[in-house]
Amino acid sequence: MASKLCRSRALASALRSAKPSPAIRCLATTSRNLINMPEGPNPRQFPREPLPGALNAAVVNPADKYQSKADNLHKYGSWLMGCLPKYIQQFSVWKDELTIYISPAGVIPVFSFLKYNTAAEYTQVSDITAVDFPTKDQRFEVVYNLLSVRHNSRIRVKTYADEVSPVPSITPLYDGANWYEREVYDLFGVFFTGHPDLRRIMTDYGFDGHPLRKDFPMTGYTEIRYDEEKKRIVTEPLEMTQAFRNFEGGSSAWEQVGAGIDRKPESFKLPTPKPETKPEEKK
């Protein structure tokens, strides 16, 4: 038995030292090394045919980029107004964005139509926010952004409110609107009737005011700090004062930084008037 084992080991060592045959080599190397590829020109280096014309001009005119979409959105907005003439006041199209304007009384009917109608199916609410216009009677503009996954379409719905008039909640229709409406209430003070849990979501407990209102002072009303003597967090009124901000007459609430850029077209710019020359008195 031992002699047979020694013979097999000697045979294996002899095979390893000898030059491998082509049959053995094909098992140890890839097939690419055994195939003789013809040497020819590289197809990637072939000369390319010249283009028929120079591509200096834009392929799509920026003015016509959204023309086809805008036409379809105008038709869709007109169709929505025809379906809900009692609630939709107007609509606007800017580029590829459709916006409809409704009254607070039409929130539930319009959103029910936009969600369940087969030509709309806006089943997802992407965002709810608000904008504060202090000079308007209805100072808050509540903005809803909806998404239709089935039709790959978006729509924006706007309504209005003030400090005391509420807006119906769409939480019974869209579960995702729960926290969005709480955020709008917390930061702007807009009330939503029918909301299951309308309370603050971002500011602290007992916070005074609504931070995103234009008349809210930048310094706030109170200061929260840790008192070393009392060994706890205390809330104290601020002694810092802020200059009165007037929103009348179209003036901005914020100071401009720098000279800015005048984007008015040249056709609307009036030439600088020349100073009047007084006629010389005759002597």
UniProtKB/Swiss-Prot annotation:
Job of this protein: Core subunit of the mitochondrial membrane respiratory chain NADH dehydrogenase (Complex I) that is believed to belong to the minimal assembly required for catalysis. Complex I functions in the transfer of electrons from NADH to the respiratory chain. The immediate electron acceptor for the enzyme is believed to be ubiquinone.
Species in which this protein is naturally found: Neurospora crassa (strain ATCC 24698 / 74-OR23-1A / CBS 708.71 / DSM 1257 / FGSC 987)
E.C. numbers: 7.1.1.2
Keyword Transcription regulation tagged: no
Keyword NAD included in the entry's annotation: yes
Protein name, UniProt field: NADH-ubiquinone oxidoreductase 30.4 kDa subunit, mitochondrial
Coiled-coil parts of chain: none
Name of the top EC class for this enzyme: translocase
Reactions it catalyzes: a ubiquinone + NADH + 5 H(+)(in) = a ubiquinol + NAD(+) + 4 H(+)(out)
UniProt entry keywords in alphabetical sequence: Electron transport, Membrane, Mitochondrion, Mitochondrion inner membrane, NAD, Oxidoreductase, Respiratory chain, Transit peptide, Translocase, Transport, Ubiquinone
Lineage of producing organism: Eukaryota, Fungi, Dikarya, Ascomycota, Pezizomycotina
Cellular-component GO terms for this entry: mitochondrial inner membrane; respiratory chain complex I
Transit peptide location on this chain: 1-17
Gene Ontology MF term list: NADH dehydrogenase (ubiquinone) activity
Quaternary structure and partners: Complex I is composed of about 40 different subunits. This is a component of the iron-sulfur protein fraction.
Record Pfam families: Complex1_30kDa
Entry's family note: Belongs to the complex I 30 kDa subunit family.
Location in the cell: Mitochondrion inner membrane
Gene: nuo-31
Disordered: annotated segments: 258-283
InterPro entries per record: NADH_DH_suC, NADH_quin_OxRdtase_su_C/D-like, NADH_UbQ_OxRdtase_30kDa_su, NADH_UbQ_OxRdtase_CS
